[in-house]
Regions:
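Conserved "HGTGT" condensation-loop signature of ketosynthase/thiolase-family condensing enzymes
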Residues: 1-109, 113-155
Length: 155
């Protein structure tokens, strides 16, 4: 069996965007769940509670060309991965493109907006709102794909 070594940590979470903040808030048993007024418009939804990710800013190198095929799920995955690579001292390391490093990233689904666009297409029999990037943003493996492309990971 091959070994996997975790050498860096990165996060964009409701508890914070760096490990020291996240760890401190976990130790404090900080509750970040809140009432989400944006969910008030959903008839039959019996909860309004959630823990949204705190606002975050992307560095300048996350330009339109780099992010145009990414939804929010992928952007967050790429940025969290970048923070982990920085923490590990591996950002820009030749290992990334050596074929010896892979990606395992679970996001369950792609971006909800893109899923909604496809749902609209199915329900209303129109491709209005569908672009060349909508499927890429919707696919469940969107974050893993975009992490690989963004950092040139070939393994």
């Amino acid at each position: 069996m091959k070994r996997v070594v975790i050498t860096g940590v990165g996060a964009l979470s409701p508890l914070g965007h760096d490990w020291s903040t996240v760890r401190a808030r976990l130790k404090e048993e900080r509750n970040v769940v809140q009432y989400l007024t944006a969910w008030d418009g959903y008839e039959g939804l019996n909860t309004r509670m959630g823990a949204p990710v705190a606002p975050f800013e992307l560095p300048a190198h996350y330009n339109r060309k780099a992010t145009r095929s990414m939804g929010r799920v992928a952007v967050m995955g790429v940025r969290a991965s970048e923070l982990a690579l920085i923490d590990a001292g591996l950002l820009g390391d030749p290992l990334l493109s050596s074929g010896r490093l892979g990606i395992s990233y679970g996001s369950s689904v792609g971006s909800p907006a893109a899923i909604g666009d496809f749902g609209n297409m199915i329900s209303h029999k129109t491709t209005e709102g569908i672009t060349a990037n909508t499927y890429i943003k919707m696919m469940s493996h969107t974050a893993a794909v975009d992490i690989g492309v963004f950092f040139g990971i070939t393994g």
